Amino acid sequence: MKRSDVMHAEVAHAAKDKETRSAVDDPITLQIIRHDLVSIPNQIDRNITRTAFSQLINEYKDYAVGIVDPDGNLISQSRGSLLIFAANALGTAVRDGLSLHGADNIAHGDVLISNHAETLGQHLNNVVMYTPVRADRGRGEIVAFFCVLMHWIDVGGIMVGSCTSTSTTEIFQEGIQFRSVKLMHRGVRSDDMFRMIQCNTRFPEMLTGDVEAQIAGCLLGRDMVGQVVGKYGVERFRAAVIAMWDHARRLSRMAVEAAPRGEFSGYAFLDNDGVHMDRTVPVGVRVRLDGKRITVDYADVADQLSGPMNAGRNGGAVAAARIAIKYLFSPEEPLTEGDFDLLDVEIPEGKFLSAHRNAPLGLSGHMIPTTVDTILRAM
């Protein structure tokens, strides 16, 4: 190559870098992208409400819609659905899938599902479905994952509804598990997977309708995020995401710096453990604030219970702490990973909010409100 050609290429590359930096630094463009990313899950949320079959979804709205980055960090989440789900579940499922498959083996058009108890720490009805958003109309790198978590009305187990028993003693009595398995591969449905799902539920027609709504939400959301990436470019997209996180971090930092410093305690109890109606369950929480970080310490909560009123660490201790912090510090702002940058969660393994592998989790959501309230009371 001639020296003049090299110089021309260097000048063109420098001009392109300058243009990219200028676009990335443009606050108006970043705000437009930010509002797109906040709006898309809300639009898919409404679509799911209209298209799902079961009342748990179209009336109770027992689901969540969100976008996470290639590492599973939350970018945005729909406001109309249950906060507990996307507070921790979406990114946790995606990270586990990446560890199993690797990013290169999750292709455009792949749709994966996970309700793995050890990973998510919630009852098996809560199924995360996710699909990659790849740049360059599906041919480029993964820039995000679009996720829809939905409460499946029945996944087998010893009781109708799967999560309604008070007598289960291990997770295997509560239904079927999926650990980031592909429901679709490169846009082609797995008939084997659909048959497996339909043969492990008491309501195959209704559940299939919900799953179809979940798939449609994933694919439409993926395309909408892909359009944003295609319009503004990967660098602008990433810059907008970082700006969202930075904004949330600033709000959290201001709140932590303004809060009184010290260790604060809260105590409550559950009326029973779901099996023994005369046995209360203590919920003791300590919150430490040092002006820089906030630590939620669950050392004083009850040990793992014999029945299904347990949750794993991600679905119990971490989820409850994140919900409490979000409610306390910036409830009016969109939910994003930056909200939790200053949060540490400490809990020994084997508590009822950090249950061991294979523990029953059927009633995993029942103790979360009390736990959140106890954290808020401590603060």
Model feature map: region roles:
Residues 2-47, 98-107, 244-259:
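Short, compositionally biased leader-like segments
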Residues 219-303:
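Accessory "access/gating" subregions that flank catalytic or transport cores
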Residues 141-200, 303-307, 315, 319, ...:
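Gly/Pro-rich active-site capping loops and adjacent beta-alpha segments
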Residues 82-89, 105, 120, 197, ...:
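Hydrophobic core positions in small helical hairpin nucleic-acid-binding modules
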Residues 126-137, 147, 287:
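A short, hydrophobic, proline-anchored segment that marks a local hinge/packing element in signaling
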Residues 36-60, 98, 102, 113-122:
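Short, basic/aromatic recognition patches
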Residues 73-77, 88-116:
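Regulatory sensory and allosteric helical modules in signal-transduction proteins
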Residues 17-33, 174-253, 374, 379:
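N-terminal leader/propeptide and maturation segments of large enzyme subunits in energy/redox metabolism
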